[in-house]
Regions:
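Glycine-/small-residue-rich "gating" segment that lines the acyl/pantetheine channel
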Residues: 125-132, 170-173, 177, 194-250, ...
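Active-site-proximal alpha-helical scaffold in enzymes
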Residues: 78-91, 141-144, 149-152, 157-193, ...
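Acyl-CoA/ACP chain-elongation machinery
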Residues: 39, 183-229, 262-274, 304-311, ...
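Conserved catalytic cysteine-centered active-site region
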Residues: 1-3, 37-80, 111-174, 183, ...
Length: 415
């Protein structure tokens, strides 16, 4: 039996560069950073005091205040992005939609860390009897999917993946396969994160993973630049509506792009330090799944976190996977503007990769002041200015702690 084709019919996102897709995309193309000093809590005793915070976000646009108070902020972001994507797709207006065939898979790398932190403080101050009865369901990672299914009445597969910073990519790739293999006709898929808290920022700072460029937040995230000194933590959510092609055509849905490949791998090397073989294997497997060659790739939305080791390693991995063609590909890191959204990043960067294909534009990688050629970072990173380009095939890379890797392949749709 031939596999069914899967297309993207809806996009939604909440991020440091905007609380809807169009605002975020416009800001990315303009090279506007969403990174600033932390306002969410007093970070004065942490050496990294900067973050890509979501600003001016109103969950009341999506659910009631009573409901919102019962859940952590990462669930807020996930619900908002999901409802945006569903609205964009026109699913609510579809006639005779079989909701038994619509599922949701929106994951998170960390989950309800702010709620866990606040509840821990409550217990220390007043004992276990003061724990909010909504603490557990308000912190669980699969509850983004759970809330969306309840809000929309979807009775297809519902779960939430957890694989550190590869979560969003894994959620999307896994969901596409559910459709290909006939387990669903539509999947709402992506990732969400809201870990800008004392524990979240302090934990990564203790690992010496974060940038300490507190005097100039907007230039702190600088992938492949010689002066990069760590990543900048971010937050938000990115969600796609994935749909079986004939199902989408039948209801006259607009189609942004087709998802044609998904590859996964493990480094089998180190909990936090990367190696090039694992990521290269994910790219190679994704292209094989898509039935494409390295020479077919036009654009890479790279993991590109702005860490000294990670950026050089990903460049090596791309050279290993794409060979000489790696020098002809646009390699872009939107994290230079959003920061690193952890488990949400595969979702938001999938949104941006789909838009790169649909709009035939690459956002810039900002803050490349002196490209780190000495470390081998010598590819075309679309430095500092957006670019019109022929982008028929885009890949999106996500790598996470534990050596988990995921690559998605998106292709310009043609009947």
């Amino acid at each position: 039996m031939s596999q069914r084709r899967v297309v993207i019919t809806g996009l939604g996102q909440v991020s440091p560069v905007g609380n809807d897709v169009q605002t975020a995309w416009n800001n990315l193309l303009s090279g506007r950073s969403g990174i600033g000093l932390i306002t969410r809590f007093d970070a004065s005793d942490i050496n990294s005091q900067i973050a890509g915070e979501v600003r001016d976000f109103d969950i009341g646009q999506y659910i009631s205040g009573k409901e919102a108070r019962r859940m952590d902020v990462f669930i807020h972001y996930g619900i908002a992005a999901a409802l945006q994507a569903i609205s964009d797709s026109g699913l609510d207006d579809a006639e005779n939609l079989d909701k038994d065939r619509v599922g949701v898979n929106i994951g998170s790398g960390i989950g309800g860390l702010p709620s866990i932190e606040a509840t821990g403080k409550t217990v220390l101050e007043g004992g276990a009897r003061r724990i909010n009865p909504f603490f557990i369901p308000g912190s669980l990672i699969n509850l983004i999917s759970g809330h969306v299914t309840i809000l929309k009445g979807y009775r297809g597969p519902s779960y939430g993946m957890v694989s550190a910073c590869t979560t969003g990519a894994h959620s999307i790739g896994d969901s596409a396969r559910l459709i290909k293999y006939g387990d669903a006709d539509v999947m709402i898929a992506g990732g969400a994160e809201g870990a800008i808290s004392t524990l979240g920022v302090g934990g990564f700072a203790a690992m010496k993973a974060l940038s300490t460029r507190n005097d100039d937040p907007a230039t702190a995230s600088r992938p492949w630049d010689k002066g990069r000194d760590g990543f900048v933590i971010g937050e938000g959510a990115g969600v796609l509506v994935l749909e079986e092609l004939e199902h989408a055509k039948k209801r006259g849905a607009k189609i942004y792009a087709e998802i044609v490949g998904f590859g996964m791998s493990s480094d089998a090397y180190h909990i936090t330090a990367p190696n090039e073989e694992g990521p290269a294997l994910a790219v190679t497997r994704a292209l094989k799944d898509a039935g494409l060659n390295p020479e077919d790739v036009d654009y890479v939305n790279a993991h590109g976190t702005s860490t000294p080791l990670g950026d050089a390693n990903e460049t090596k991995a791309l050279k290993l996977a794409l060979g000489d063609h790696s020098r002809k590909v646009i390699v872009n890191s939107t994290k230079s503007m959003t920061g690193h959204l952890l488990g949400a990043v595969g979702g938001v960067e999938a949104v941006y990769s789909v838009l790169a294909v649909h709009e035939q534009k690459s956002p810039p990688t900002i803050n490349i002041f002196e490209q780190d050629i000495e470390a081998g970072c010598d590819l075309d990173y679309c430095a500092n200015e957006a670019r019109d380009a022929k982008i028929d095939v885009a890949i999106s890379n996500s790598f996470g702690f534990g050596g988990t890797n995921g690559t998605l392949v998106f292709k310009k749709f043609s009947g």
